[in-house]
UniProtKB/Swiss-Prot annotation:
Similarity section: Belongs to the KptA/TPT1 family.
GO BP term, example: tRNA splicing, via endonucleolytic cleavage and ligation
Molecular-function GO terms, alphabetical: NAD+ poly-ADP-ribosyltransferase activity; tRNA 2'-phosphotransferase activity
Protein name: Probable RNA 2'-phosphotransferase
Protein species of origin: Burkholderia pseudomallei (strain K96243)
Length: 184
């Protein structure tokens, strides 16, 4: 692996931490929709030991395989696409999901999921993937993946609303266990 890969990975993790969970850790302010001023972010990131140029920031945003970050059109503001634990309203419109979505998890979480369903944990929403491959990639980070199938029509019928983030992750407040198809 090249040193630029490790720098990009480190920068991505830093940005995730700051833009999703702890903007206060470096003194950055997020607006109500989760946007941070790029100039302020770059200045305060450098003071915290994560010096990035605007071009490097744009590269991290463009090349992040999960498209975790979004820059506005003139690259003056940035936000995380989803996954916030801080209070933000991404103002994503309600949208009809595909008939089936997927959630990647690991075996050690299954007992709790069977009892409680999928809950947002420390986030605002449950994250669902549009395909099995993405769900597998998400789960593999934490161990041997277990893929759960969510048929969305029953959730829609019962009043659940879905939103889709800028990077294609489907968001829903919760998925009770009765809506989950568990593997054999």
């Amino acid at each position: 692996m090249s040193s630029s890969y490790f720098i990009a990975t480190r920068a991505s993790k830093f940005l995730s931490y700051v833009l999703r969970h702890r903007p206060d850790s470096i003194g950055v302010t997020l607006d109500a929709q989760g946007w941070a001023d790029v100039s302020e972010l770059l200045t305060k990131a450098a003071a915290a030991g994560m010096a990035l140029t605007l071009d490097e920031l744009k590269q991290v945003v463009a090349e992040n395989d999960k498209k975790r970050f979004v820059l506005n059109d003139d690259a003056t503001r940035i936000r995380a696409a989803q996954g916030h634990s801080v209070d933000v309203d991404l103002q994503l419109p309600v949208k009809a999901p595909p008939p089936v979505l997927y959630h990647g998890t690991v075996g050690k979480s299954m007992a709790d999921i069977r009892k409680q369903g999928l809950t947002p944990m420390n986030r605002h929403d449950v994250h669902l993937s549009p395909d099995r491959e993405t769900a597998t990639r998400v789960a593999t980070r934490r161990g041997k993946p277990v893929i759960l199938v969510i048929e969305t029509y029953p959730l829609l019928r019962d009043g659940y609303q879905f939103r889709v983030s800028d990077n294609g992750v489907w968001l829903v407040p919760e998925v009770p266990a009765k809506y989950i198809k568990f593997p054999g």
